[in-house]
Amino acid sequence: QDLPGNDNSTATLCLGHYAMPNGTLVKTITDDQIEVPNATELVQSSSTGKICNNPHRILDGRDCTLIDALLGDPHCDVFQDETWDLFVERSNAFSNCYPYDVPDYASLRSLVASSGTLEFITEGFTWTGVTQNGGSNACKRGPASGFFSRLNWLTKSGSTYPVLNVTMPNNDNFDKLYIWGVHHPSTDQEQTNLYVQASGRVTVSTRRSQQTIIPNIGSRPWVRGQSGRISIYWTIVKPGDVLVINSNGNLIAPRGYFKMRTGKSSIMRSDAPIDTCISECITPNGSIPNDKPFQNVNKITYGACPKYVKQNTLKLATGMRNVPEKQTRGLFGAIAGFIENGWEGMIDGWYGFRHQNSEGTGQAADLKSTQAAIDQINGKLNRVIEKTNEKFHQIEKEFSEVEGRIQDLEKYVEDTKIDLWSYNADVLVALENQHTIDLTDSEMNKLFEKTKRQLRENAEDMGNGCFKIYHKCDNACVESIRNGTYDHDVYRDESLNNRFQIKGVELKSGYKDWILWISFAISCFLLCVVLLGFIMWACQRGNIRCNICI
């Protein structure tokens, strides 16, 4: 007689989730390595190798530095009145005018870079009793000697150099940047030949500040045929303030002012070529996509960029826990549910059903539970990007030699920030991965409990993610369970009858075992009784003597 469980009167329904033979390892709060079918890389580790000129306005400095363009070096005249979002300085940039230094070079460079413009307004300074527009063979403009176009070199007129005292008020409603300088002759003879006085002095003042510079006469290494130097200084005049210039020699005077603007413009040293393309994020290595929350291409960035971290890779789980299917089982040789392993080949959903009934076997995804999980996971990457992407640029830090301790401190602070963000990135991704796996496990359990509530007493939980259904359940019946329209009352009587038959047969088939165990117990008892009787009989006849000593 066939068991009712083995004919067409029952069916098996299993619930499971998607799996693949080889998943991806991710990190969670509770596990350093846990396998998931799908994961998204969060660290951008390569650049395009070129700087995109859209949406940011890129100004290629070519063979000019920003300061040379600011001063008006003859070979940088093309940059007059230019504007930019990002000024790109090249490693092959050079100066081609009178040798100079800027005592506060980094601050001036940063100030002008952030202003984003070289817009220059000429003003009518009156320099009485001196010769203007001095030039040098070190600064050729065409075949003739020249000088920085934004500066005015003042020398003696005849045999006199009077004391100069010039004022220039700021009657506008914006800040004005004035660039001026002091000439340091190489010899005392050069000093008197140019300025008469043996020692000059330059004082530039506003209501808020004052700078007094005394020339330092002496020979220096020859540069472009000159052993003298010019020191470049700068002064910002606020609206309503007044610029006052006082000098008795060695003054490199301003010709006007640069209009200061506030903005998010910047400067970057890079040799990457500039190309016609679109990218929000720029590094010295080239533009990089900003569709990831982290990058380890370069610490220096401009635009909306991923946060720099030390890690080469951080993977965000976008799927559930991966438990590869046991290949020895066969597809339906003995189907099992999610408690034992996942299912391979289920490509149209994350969660689904497998069944075995009178019509054969089948598999289908549960789109509702799959969509519920995807809806919660979707946007996770965007949320991480929003939390981490820089909305400002990370500028280069430059310090002069005398600011070495400040530079060391700045480097320590930057390194500490990177360490903290690298740690934060690890924790953030681990938390998100933990949440994703817990979420997908929860959706699987919800689907299982929903199915269990539908079937009620018509089926039995087999403990492996499957149900044994105690009534005939064709494909239409299985579909009703999947879509939630199953009516357990329709199959209640059939299920109850089949359950009793199956349990009854299982009980009868187990009688042999009970009889064997009872027979064995009785045989052991009788053997013990016979052995005890023999010992007592032998003791009475004297064949066995038992001595008890106290």
UniProtKB/Swiss-Prot annotation:
Annotated family: Belongs to the influenza viruses hemagglutinin family.
Native source organism of the sequence: Influenza A virus (strain A/Duck/Hokkaido/5/1977 H3N8)
Function comment: Binds to sialic acid-containing receptors on the cell surface, bringing about the attachment of the virus particle to the cell. This attachment induces virion internalization either through clathrin-dependent endocytosis or through clathrin- and caveolin-independent pathway. Plays a major role in the determination of host range restriction and virulence. Class I viral fusion protein. Responsible for penetration of the virus into the cell cytoplasm by mediating the fusion of the membrane of the endocytosed virus particle with the endosomal membrane.
Keywords from the UniProt entry: Clathrin- and caveolin-independent endocytosis of virus by host, Clathrin-mediated endocytosis of virus by host, Disulfide bond, Fusion of virus membrane with host endosomal membrane, Fusion of virus membrane with host membrane, Glycoprotein, Hemagglutinin, Host cell membrane, Host membrane, Host-virus interaction, Lipoprotein, Membrane, Palmitate, Transmembrane, Transmembrane helix, Viral attachment to host cell, Viral envelope protein, Viral penetration into host cytoplasm, Virion, Virus endocytosis by host, Virus entry into host cell
Lipidation (S-palmitoyl cysteine): C539, C546, C549
Source species taxonomy: Viruses, Riboviria, Orthornavirae, Negarnaviricota, Polyploviricotina
Cytoplasmic-facing ranges: 536-550
Encoding gene, per UniProt annotation: HA
Protein name: Hemagglutinin
Chain positions carrying an annotated carbohydrate: N8, N22, N38, N165, N285, N483
Keyword Translocase carried by entry: no
GO CC terms in record: host cell plasma membrane; membrane; viral envelope; virion membrane
Transmembrane segments: 515-535
S-S bonds: C14-C466, C52-C277, C64-C76, C97-C139, C281-C305, C473-C477
